[in-house]
């Protein structure tokens, strides 16, 4: 995986500067690849990609997604050791550059326009339907095990959007997903986080302020940050977040 966007033409300098300031840097990584990427081509050649729609559905940066311009993005098969090895092969470049933490998004994974027949596909562990909920742990363990194998002196830090029983052995932190920005949503986070800790993993948190905040944009796009109602919600959510790891 590479920094190909011209906005990050000096990625190594950026990482080094963050470290010079005695801070750590995390990067968002996904479990899916577009057809023009190196991981996609290698995984496809070996039959290690699932065949269903995932995010982003469109190759155009418009909303709602333009289905007439499909992205062709596909999720990889993390149940396969070979696929996990390939994933790390490309990810290891970022590790060598000094990335400190992995924000593993879409470890659910995103499954758009869901059809029940999508679950009838085979994966490296047999029927995808029978092991679907195991998907996040296989993704997280793949990164955790590979980094530990090459770097025993540095703690592996992972933030993942989804969780399965047993995943706590990787020390991964999970958040409750893309949730609405509302008082009702904030109230729900308390029992959600408490219930999560019953799985023997206390490392859970939420999106402070919520994720979908469009209802507060009453004065135009991104105006919610100046909305007193949203500011109050954000402050209270920040107070709650202070007690979440």
Range-by-range predicted roles:
Residues 1-245:
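Catalytic-domain carbohydrate-binding cleft regions of carbohydrate-active enzymes
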